[in-house]
């Protein structure tokens, strides 16, 4: 029987097999291969003796929290308190894209925007949608449900963006602790510790917003350009880094307004970090 590990406590793994839950222990062979089960693992189990017989090949995995086979990252992005930072947003998009995880942007606190600010946000949303990155707001639970359908999902985003609040909306039984923004620091506080997948409609969602996607130092500099999907253009040189090369189509598109200038500026900034 096959299923997905949704919880691990000590050496006991809870496996979801089509809605039926089995508490299983990994066979001893895993200890000799340095393979430890992770939440999100697709596994084969012996449902009679309650053993995990095999762990399927992982398509990706995260360290904190330890989750494998993540399909999508819901990037909760505050537009007020803390202020919208396209640099942080693009950094998180690059990070999850590099890990073969689909980025989905969820803007929060849009009710705090002025009319003019809402118009500017619409332009930003229109651009990200155009390059294939889906966007929503934390007030549209119906749309969020559709975007996450059938996927293993983690939440990420800057602290204070409302990740725990959104998780509590998706699953009120979680009753996750949320901290208000620190007035002095202008940022939120981390309040969650562990990871477990809970069922939401047809999706499995990590119950912790603790995944940090702000460190991109593990991405090789020459591969950063691949995490900016709209940079996939026919430049004169195949190995064009879109920095100082001549006849670079990416720079031409930026100058023509076809690529958002903040995206290109952030790319150059990340390469220099």
What is each PLM-predicted segment?
Residues 1-9:
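Structural detector for short beta-strands of small beta-barrel domains
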Residues 100-101, 132:
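Glycine-centered short loops/turns at secondary-structure junctions
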Residues 76-86:
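Short, glycine-rich nucleotide/cofactor-binding loops
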Residues 21-37:
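Beta-strand/loop nucleic-acid-binding surfaces
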Residues 13-17, 24, 45, 52:
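SH3/SH3-like beta-barrel fold
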Residues 11, 34-49, 56-73, 78, ...:
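Helix-rich effector regions associated with P-loop NTPase G domains
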Residues 112-161:
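Canonical P-loop GTPase G-domain recognition
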């Amino acid at each position: 029987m096959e299923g997905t590990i949704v919880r691990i406590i000590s050496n006991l793994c809870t496996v979801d097999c089509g809605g039926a839950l089995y508490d299983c222990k990994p066979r001893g062979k895993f200890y000799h291969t340095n393979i430890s089960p992770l939440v999100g693992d697709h596994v084969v189990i012996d449902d009679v003796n309650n053993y995990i017989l095999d762990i399927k090949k992982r398509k990706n995995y995260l360290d904190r929290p330890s989750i494998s086979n993540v399909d999508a990252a819901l990037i909760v992005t505050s537009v007020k308190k803390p202020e919208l930072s396209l640099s942080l947003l693009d950094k998180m998009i690059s990070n999850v894209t590099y890990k073969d995880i689909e980025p989905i942007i969820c803007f929060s606190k849009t009710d705090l925007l002025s009319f003019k600010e809402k118009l500017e946000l619409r332009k930003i949303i229109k651009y990200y949608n155009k390059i294939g990155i889906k966007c929503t707001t934390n007030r549209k639970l119906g749309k969020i449900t559709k975007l996450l359908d059938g996927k293993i999902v983690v939440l990420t985003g800057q602290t204070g963006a409302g990740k725990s609040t959104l998780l509590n909306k998706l699953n009120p039984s979680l009753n996750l602790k949320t901290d208000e923004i620190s007035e002095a620091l202008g940022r939120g506080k981390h309040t969650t510790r562990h990871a477990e997948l809970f069922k939401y409609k047809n999706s499995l969602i990590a119950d912790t917003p603790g995944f940090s996607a702000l460190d991109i130092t593990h991405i090789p500099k020459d591969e950063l350009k691949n995490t900016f999907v709209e940079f996939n253009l026919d430049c004169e040189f195949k190995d064009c880094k879109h920095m100082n090369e001549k006849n670079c189509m990416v720079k031409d598109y930026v100058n023509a307004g076809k690529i958002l200038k903040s995206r290109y500026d952030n790319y150059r900034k990340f390469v220099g970090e």
